[in-house]
């Protein structure tokens, strides 16, 4: 049924549902809630439910480890895609952001400097992600957005990595779309 709503085949919908039940450790009803959120986002953002679902399939289980609910991963993916980040890049971008801001004591010196620029610490962010991953990410994007223009790109690069700059920059500059 949600295959029709997302304009994907029943086989693809069933495939994703089965994978999500396993990888997200959820039951069928919980997976259907995610599908409903994805369908809503696809209907209300400049992207499609199928593109969002593809990114969720790629990044949401990593998001769960870092403290971000799969529905929030869907919202992050939809926001990036609505701002022009291609669907095939979004999943990788989201995974890189999750990985890089959760290094804690293993963060590089440049990452630690970037967090300090934001008034944060790598260890503090990693711990905060486990309590409220989505809220912590919003705080990071908001803090980057408040930096002087000449510091934004280098901070995005240090925190998220070169391959996630585009998505991170677009979310930072259009944070209301994510909220």
Question: Predicted segment positions?
Answer:
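Short coil/turn linkers that connect adjacent helices within long alpha-helical scaffolds
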Residues: 45-46, 63-66
């Amino acid at each position: 049924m949600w295959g029709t709503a997302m304009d994907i085949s029943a086989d693809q919908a069933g495939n994703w549902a089965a994978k999500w039940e396993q990888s997200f450790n959820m039951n069928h009803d919980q997976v259907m809630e995610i599908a409903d959120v994805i369908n809503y986002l696809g209907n209300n953002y400049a992207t499609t439910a199928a593109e969002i679902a593809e990114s969720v399939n790629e990044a949401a289980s990593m998001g769960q480890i870092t403290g971000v609910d799969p529905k929030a991963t869907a919202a992050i993916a939809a926001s990036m895609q609505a701002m022009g980040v291609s669907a095939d890049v979004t999943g990788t971008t989201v995974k890189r952001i999750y990985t890089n801001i959760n290094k804690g004591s293993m963060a590089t010196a440049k990452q630690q400097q970037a967090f300090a620029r934001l008034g944060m610490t790598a260890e503090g962010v990693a711990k905060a992600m486990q309590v409220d991953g989505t809220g912590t990410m919003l705080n990071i994007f908001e803090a980057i957005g408040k930096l002087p223009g000449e510091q934004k790109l280098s901070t995005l690069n240090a925190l998220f990595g070169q391959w996630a700059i585009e998505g991170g920059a677009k979310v930072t500059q259009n944070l209301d779309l994510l909220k």
